[in-house]
């Protein structure tokens, strides 16, 4: 059994300044350890999402090519997977169930056909939306697996 004096239980002062500072320091240390891990996991999740979306585009583009006999031109863009471009008799889309997704940084994907690296190139320019960069700003492409 734990014995407490009435004087201690009725003390209205609460926590001392030193105790509060110690608690704040401990919370700060824990946040300093957890936050970088969380940020790295978020970056990895965005990378995986972008690669999955590019693969989805690739599957839809291949189906488009099987129906039409070619990939959409750069001018037709990825929108040709959702809306029939003019003059295509054998278009049997839409080839995507939903509207074209933006990349995880809320920017549109870049599409070129013919591409420099294959029949088409699809690129997400990362967080900064410009070519090149490292980390969150790096480009994620259809030709790099």
Show where each model-derived region lies.
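A generic short alpha-helical patch detector that favors 3-5-residue windows
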Residues: 26, 49-52, 73
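Ser/Thr-glycine-rich phosphate-binding loops at phosphate-binding pockets of nucleotides
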Residues: 16, 41, 73
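Aliphatic-rich helix starts adjacent to a transmembrane/signal segment
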Residues: 37-56
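Conserved amphipathic alpha-helical interaction elements at protein-protein interfaces in regulatory
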Residues: 7, 40, 44, 63-67
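N-terminal single-pass transmembrane signal-anchor helix
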Residues: 12-38
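N-terminal leader/signal peptides at the extreme start of proteins
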Residues: 1-15
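Low-complexity, acidic interaction segments enriched in glycine
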Residues: 55, 59-145
């Amino acid at each position: 059994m734990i014995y407490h004096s009435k004087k201690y239980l009725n003390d209205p002062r609460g926590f001392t300044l030193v105790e509060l500072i110690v608690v704040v320091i401990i919370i700060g240390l824990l946040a300093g350890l957890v936050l970088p891990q969380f940020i790295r996991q978020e970056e990895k999740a965005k990378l995986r999402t972008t690669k999955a979306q590019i693969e989805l585009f690739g599957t839809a583009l291949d189906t488009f090519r099987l129906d039409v006999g070619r990939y959409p031109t750069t001018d037709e863009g990825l929108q040709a997977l959702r809306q029939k471009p003019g003059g295509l008799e054998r278009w049997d889309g839409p080839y995507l169930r939903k509207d074209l997704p933006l990349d995880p940084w809320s920017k549109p994907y870049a599409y070129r056909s013919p591409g420099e690296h294959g029949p088409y190139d699809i690129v997400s320019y990362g967080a900064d939306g410009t070519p090149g960069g490292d980390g969150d700003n790096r480009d994620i492409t259809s030709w790099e697996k």
